Amino acid sequence: MKQYLEALEYILENGKDRDDRTGVGTRGVFGYQMRFDLRKEFPAVTTKKLAWKSVVSELLWFLEGSSDERRLAEIHYGKPREELVGKNTIWTANADKQAKDLGYVNTDTIKDLGPVYGHQWRTWDAALGFVDQIAEVLENMHYDPNSRRHIVSAWNADRVNVMALPPCHTMFQFHIQDGELSCQLYQRSADMFLGVPFNIASYSLLTHMFAQLLDLKVGDFVWTGGDCHIYQNHFEQVKQQIIRTPVAGPTLEMPAFKDLDELVKTTPNDYKLIGYNPMDSIKAPMAV
């Protein structure tokens, strides 16, 4: 993850300061790219601790197609929602603020976020029903591996204004070459300290999952960012992180699954990072 530390340092030194939606203020650059070789190791940040269980929980929640924050809590904690009152997830703040302001149901057991990622991935609204983009991209990669159309988008312009949070990681594309599956993500808005290590791990895991479904090996994960920023109240944490020296990354251990239905029935505890030895966590507030 040396390239990630280099990105932080570059933005801190060369970025421009500007106001933002949250009122916190950022320093950022427009346009940045990083490439990770998934053949060698899993790109989990080692210069601070990655919230791995949260990464897996959210991805399984997306793949299930849910937009209920309390369903994410069930996946993460492995308990029914009735037992999880007061137990938060990484989406609770958005549910209790933006989604509530939009008029969505917000109770102890249901917290609707509107048509966010999972909805767009699995039930994109179409003229004659809906499109299951995940099922379609898997089918298309199986039958037409050389296609340049292996794309999933979460950016639905007609629905953005009714989402609790418009998608930050907006679209991703797969590429198959020589029996290897690679993935490129475009992230329109990139919280470089808190969000990006999480997103890198999430889409790298997705690439491993889909490679297993398609009986392929993994290739590269390419991360491309649009507005790449560091929040002003993260400056000291970033300075602390970039002086740390990264160590070797882990390898990924996944459960067996042969189709999408079996995949979405797996649990966060089924996915393990072997040989993951991160340094201490660096706490920072999330801008909402």
Residue positions per predicted region:
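Terminal, non-catalytic protein-protein interaction segments that mediate quaternary/complex assembly
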Residues: 1-288
